[in-house]
Amino acid sequence: MGKIIGIDLGTTNSCVSVMEGGEPVVIPNSEGGRTTPSIVGFTSKDERVVGQPAKNQMITNPERTVYSVKRFIGHRYSELTDELKRVPYKIVPQGEDVRIDIDGKLYSTQEISAFILQKMKKTAEDYLGETVTEAVITVPAYFNDAQRQATKDAGKIAGLEVKRIINEPTAASLAFGFNKDSKKEKTIAVYDLGGGTFDISILELGDGVFEVKSTNGDTHLGGDDFDNRIVNWLVDEFKKDTGIDLSKDRMALQRLREAAEKAKIELSSVANTEVNLPFITADANGPKHLQKSLSRAKFEQMTEDLFERTKEPCRKALKDAGITPDKIDDILLVGGSTRMPKVLQIIKEIFGKEGSKSVNPDEAVAMGAAIQGGILGGDVKDVLLLDVTPLSLGIETMGGVFTPLINRNTTIPTRKSQVFSTAADGQTAVSIHVLQGERGMASQNRTLGNFDLVGIPPAPRGVPQIEVTFDIDANGIVHVSAKDLGTGKEQHIRIESSSGLSESEIDRMVKEAEANAENDKLEKEKVEAKNNADSLIYQTEKTLKEMGDKIGAADKQKIEAAIADLRQALNSDNTADIKAKTENLQQAAYKIAEEMYKQQGAQAGADPNAGSSQGAQAGTDYGTSGPKTGTADDVDYEVVNDDNDK
């Protein structure tokens, strides 16, 4: 059985890890980075690039570079009014679903996420030297059912069997507690502020058991929001100074975003930073430059409400877990945004102690996912992970009321049944409206799905007995059934992702992804063949120039013809032809080497074979008095004191 890899599919960056020698190892990508930007770019040549190469084209090609797609996955188009304005690429509705429009071709958020997952899969395969087909993928703890299902679909499109969807804070706690002294029980809080989401989880650790007591969060709060505040400030300041509105210029906006992220990162270690963007735009008077100084105090002032938004989820999580802040032994900091000094201040304020920096905030989640992969694969023993469902699940009952069947922070997997009845006399069917959320009325919560149970015998209201059962699996994905206890009729529903991807659409995307992977492989093969050919032409021409007068005219002509043929082949995209003609030139070029060795032999003595026999002698015999091959002679060594040389 192959390895089960762990993937942290992040908003800003992604990371992949695997268990090696009983420990989780973070795998560097082909560019050498331990994390990979979660960015997909489409070049002017219709090629697709992922990671750093995609990030490199963000400024020059903003409309064809997709980033922060995790903020959209599993959402309906109507839920994204504010988010849509923040990105330069085009997002359009397809029914209720979200699609990303790249030159008229529509991509689902799952497909874009799958391209990132494929990059992580390839990174792991290059490292392990074997095909990878199974993965554990992490999601924010506060992701709802639709977002979890959409993430699972993305894995399937990428050619991965998703063995488990695991919550990011839980994964980080695994990385923190793995192989530690497991006898001592600890209560920890995981404060996870990433690029697009915020989670807080309270866990109890001890004797190999990792039990989540409560979780809370905000799936629309992360580093991107802090960057946007700086961008808005820069736009306003520049407009005040010049009268020019940069928010209408997509290329300028992308430069501002990069500068804002850089400024935010710098302000974690310095009190003041400069934002310098020469030639940001131009008007009739010539080019304009942007130069602004930003202090940490000013940054914290403009983002104060964002920092405040992390406090309430922390208080709710503590309340749901039934513990006070003083009972927390450690606070783990996860996600790059936790490096901001203000975050450390907030943690001290809420929990009364400093946050722990014992795990790498960028890598801990992927490492925890790899450990979970090890547990599922049987490589890791004596570790039990007990997670919870982040939101209450229930149905709509009479009067539009939301009736929860499974309350938030219930340990999963779990199953719960409740008996309901009809609301009207003679009712022969009931419509089950499945919801997720914490509000009292059904309309205020998120619809997961609807289904009907039909064929109920007519009876007075309140007489039929309809048993509704909720089943949440270990991935946090919901299955619901309704059964008429009188007739035994039953109806099941597996809540599908609100992305609306059908099985046939997912299968089509899987096939497209496989075809693209094959195309990528062929493209790489072609590039390597061309590089080898170029290198051989250069080397052969150089040698021909130096040794041309030492080989016969016929041989020289043959080599030059082979070079010309290969040059012509390079103008085409026929990899097989390039390889064949490279081989022809290689064979022809051997003639040069042959002539060189012949002439060296001739110079060494009248006998043309003298050189080669001397060469053989040199390799096996150091002379009549030296040691012979295959024997071991005693040698005296003299120790030299070289202290004076130091």
UniProtKB/Swiss-Prot annotation:
Induction note: By stress conditions e.g. heat shock.
Keyword Nucleotide-binding assigned: yes
Chain segments carrying region Disordered: 599-646
Bias (Acidic residues) ranges: 633-646
GO molecular function, one term: ATP-dependent protein folding chaperone
Composition-biased stretches (Polar residues): 610-628
Domain of life of the source: Bacteria
Residues bearing the modification Phosphothreonine: T197
Pfam families, sorted: HSP70
This protein's UniProt keywords: ATP-binding, Chaperone, Nucleotide-binding, Phosphoprotein, Stress response
Alphabetized InterPro entries for the sequence: ATPase_NBD, Chaperone_DnaK, Heat_shock_70_CS, HSP70_C_sf, HSP70_peptide-bd_sf, Hsp_70_fam
Family membership noted in the UniProt record: Belongs to the heat shock protein 70 family.
NCBIfam families for the chain: PRK00290.1, PRK05183.1, prok_dnaK
Function: Acts as a chaperone.
Protein's recorded name: Chaperone protein DnaK
Taxonomy of the source species: Bacteria, Pseudomonadati, Spirochaetota, Spirochaetia, Spirochaetales
Gene (UniProt): dnaK
